[in-house]
């Protein structure tokens, strides 16, 4: 069964097809999933992700069932595989926002319904789908290739963007503090994919070098959910990595800024630059709705072929 746990499991053609279908659904909404049910399991808080998924299934003609971790017997020690067998047999799709990626993998092994990663500590693939759609809308893909800079933590967004760029053949430059590392296994995967796709990938510690000649600038919070106790240390380590006027001046003249939100002004991005690019950032957030619609339809079609 086809799940959506990471972009690694999808081909270039499949990813671009999702983006193109999202564009179609944005222009012309259709009820393509009449009476289908989506279970939404959250171990972490959510604003945009929950809204995108709940609205997506509803507007497609289905219904959503929200389940926080406190609602489930998982919180009392029931094995993930048992919960997966029950929920996966009752619904058409399962969306999960989890603390550990292993929870997703275990759930997917036993679920009869396709499982979607709506965020884990390793990957945030639905966000990157939304980013890709936004890049296309704002005409930042030239001949199918985008020039991207990612400035920030070696987190789920960095991992997912590295994988997407490697598969799609993009040019991506990543900048982060010297003591931060990308998972060797994820880096190795990206390098192998780059040999196939022709992607140009670089990793360094100078944000200005990474930003040169880029059309798309991406940043993210320095302190992810669950890292609140590390806030003081991380803010100190990321000093100098803010995206501000000087930083954006190094990128191409009409470069856009993307941020998955929530944004912490004065840290990863300045107030002035955030507001200057607010239109694209909030359209990026809205576009999650349409890529989720496309994803649900894709997974439903895959089930029909089994």
Across the structure, where does each feature detected by a protein language model lie?
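Adenosine-phosphate binding glycine-rich loop
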Residues: 254-255, 261-306
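Glycine-rich phosphate/diphosphate-binding loop of Rossmann-like nucleotide-binding domains
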Residues: 43-56, 140-219
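Anion-binding alpha/beta catalytic cores of soluble intermediary-metabolism enzymes, centered on
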Residues: 92-164, 259
């Amino acid at each position: 069964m086809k799940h959506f746990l990471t972009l690694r499991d999808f081909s270039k053609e499949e990813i671009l097809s999702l983006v193109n279908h999202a564009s179609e659904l944005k222009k012309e909404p259709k009820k393509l999933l009449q009476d289908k049910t989506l279970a939404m399991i959250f171990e972490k808080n959510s604003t945009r992700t929950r809204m995108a998924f709940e609205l997506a299934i509803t507007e497609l003609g289905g219904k959503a069932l929200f389940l926080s971790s406190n609602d489930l017997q998982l919180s009392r020690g029931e094995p993930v595989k048992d919960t997966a067998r029950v929920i996966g047999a009752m619904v058409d799709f399962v969306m999960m926002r989890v603390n550990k990626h292993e929870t997703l993998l275990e759930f997917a092994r036993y679920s009869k319904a396709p499982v979607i990663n709506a965020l884990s500590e390793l990957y945030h693939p639905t966000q990157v789908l939304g980013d890709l759609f936004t890049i296309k809308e704002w005409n930042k893909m030239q001949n199918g290739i985008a020039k991207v800079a990612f400035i920030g933590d070696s987190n789920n967004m960095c991992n997912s963007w590295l994988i997407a760029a490697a598969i799609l053949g993009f040019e991506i430059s990543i900048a982060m503090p010297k003591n931060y590392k990308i998972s060797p296994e994820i880096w190795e995967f990206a390098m192998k994919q780059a040999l196939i796709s022709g992607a140009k990938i670089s990793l360094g510690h100078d944000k200005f070098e990474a930003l040169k000649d880029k059309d798309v600038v991406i940043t993210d919070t320095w302190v992810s959910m669950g890292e609140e106790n590390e806030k003081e240390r991380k803010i100190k380590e990321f000093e100098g990595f803010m995206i501000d006027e000087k930083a954006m001046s190094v990128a191409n003249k009409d470069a856009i800024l993307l941020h998955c939100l929530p944004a912490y002004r004065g840290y990863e991005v300045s107030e002035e630059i955030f507001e200057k690019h607010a239109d694209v950032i909030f359209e990026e957030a809205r576009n999650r709705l349409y890529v989720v619609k496309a994803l649900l339809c894709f997974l439903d079609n895959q089930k029909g072929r089994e």
